[in-house]
Amino acid sequence: MSEQAPIPFELKKLIDVAGDLELAVELRLHTIPMIGRLGSQEALVALLDIAGNQKATYRERDLALKTAREVLKVLASRRD
């Protein structure tokens, strides 16, 4: 079994903010594109986790899914 690389500190902080349901929705929505700009596989997984979170608002889930799609395009182009 391969070990997973540790999550970078910046990404961990952004994930914490995006997942904190006690924070304002607008703040959480602002964090999602920031996660996407990191453009890593870990960021993609984090975005998919947000998109799959039933407690997140529809807007958060939709934005996370759209952002994940963009990150996936970037990751796919790096492999070509």
Residue ranges of predicted features:
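Alpha-helical repeat scaffolds
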Residues: 79-80
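Structural detector for internal amphipathic alpha-helices that build alpha-solenoid repeat scaffolds
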Residues: 1-7, 16, 26-40, 58-76
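Buried hydrophobic core positions in alpha-solenoid tandem helical repeats
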Residues: 13-15, 46-48
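Core helices of alpha-solenoid repeat scaffolds
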Residues: 7-11, 44
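Short, charge-rich amphipathic alpha-helical segments embedded
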Residues: 40-46
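Short inter-helical turns and helix N-cap capping residues of alpha-solenoid HEAT/ARM repeat scaffolds
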Residues: 22-24, 54-57
